[in-house]
Amino acid sequence: MEAEAGGLEELTDEEMAALGKEELVRRLRREEAARLAALVQRGRLMQEVNRQLQGHLGEIRELKQLNRRLQAENRELRDLCCFLDSERQRGRRAARQWQLFGTQASRAVREDLGGCWQKLAELEGRQEELLRENLALKELCLALGEEWGPRGGPGGAVGSGAGPTPELALPPCGPRDLGDGSSSTGSVGSPDQLPLACSPDD
């Protein structure tokens, strides 16, 4: 039974001689069938390995193509990044130039505005001074008009023949022109100017 369980290669010559012819043929066929089944299984395994190998080779080819495409995209992205970086540097330089220009322009505008305000203040002061002068002249003309009113007024009787002495005679009073057009007392035909008798003989 132990000899039957083992293969023919495990039997000695004496054991093989002790076995019958039919037993030897049966064992030989059984071993051939086992070897054939092993060969078939090995062939199937080889086919599976070849199929997997072909699949891996296809994946490798696809990965190579993908790698080439990614490398091309990488080059394009690198070129784009270089271009964008140069544009960024150019934009920063332009921004600095515009900032410098804006600073200089604002400084010039502030200086011009300060000069304009100073001139405006001077003009306002001059205008106030002229107004004060005009008011003083107006008051002076009114006072002189009251003092040298028409004959028969407070200065003398009508038809008395008495007149002011030559020492008190007034000089001719012409219209005063201040030259700036802001005074209303020195203009001819002004409504607030009284008809003054500039000379006692008038």
Swiss-Prot record:
Modified residues (N-acetylmethionine): 1
Alphabetical GO biological process terms: cell differentiation; negative regulation of cell growth; negative regulation of DNA-templated transcription; negative regulation of fat cell differentiation
GO cellular component: adherens junction; centrosome; cytoplasm; nucleus
Tissue: Expressed in white and brown adipose tissue.
A Pfam cross-reference name: CCDC85
Keywords of the record: Acetylation, Cell junction, Coiled coil, Cytoplasm, Cytoskeleton, Differentiation, Growth regulation, Nucleus, Repressor, Transcription, Transcription regulation
Coiled coil regions, renumbered to chain: 44-82, 118-141
Transmembrane portions of the chain: none
GO MF annotation, one: delta-catenin binding
Region of interest (Disordered), residue spans: 152-202
Main localization category: nucleus
Stretches with biased composition (Gly residues): 152-162
Record-linked InterPro entries: CCDC85 (IPR019359)
Subcellular location: Nucleus; Cytoplasm, Cytoskeleton, Microtubule organizing center, Centrosome; Cell junction, Adherens junction
Family, similarity comment: Belongs to the CCDC85 family.
Quaternary structure and partners: Interacts with CEBPB. May interact with CEBPD. Interacts with EURL. Interacts with MCRS1. Interacts with TCF7L2; competes with CTNNB1. Interacts with ANKRD26. Interacts with the beta-catenin family proteins ARVCF, CTNND1, CTNND2 and PKP4.
Function of the molecule: Functions as a transcriptional repressor. May inhibit the activity of CTNNB1 in a TP53-dependent manner and thus regulate cell growth. May function in adipocyte differentiation, negatively regulating mitotic clonal expansion. Plays a role in cell-cell adhesion and epithelium development through its interaction with proteins of the beta-catenin family.
Name of the protein in question: Coiled-coil domain-containing protein 85B
Organism field: Mus musculus
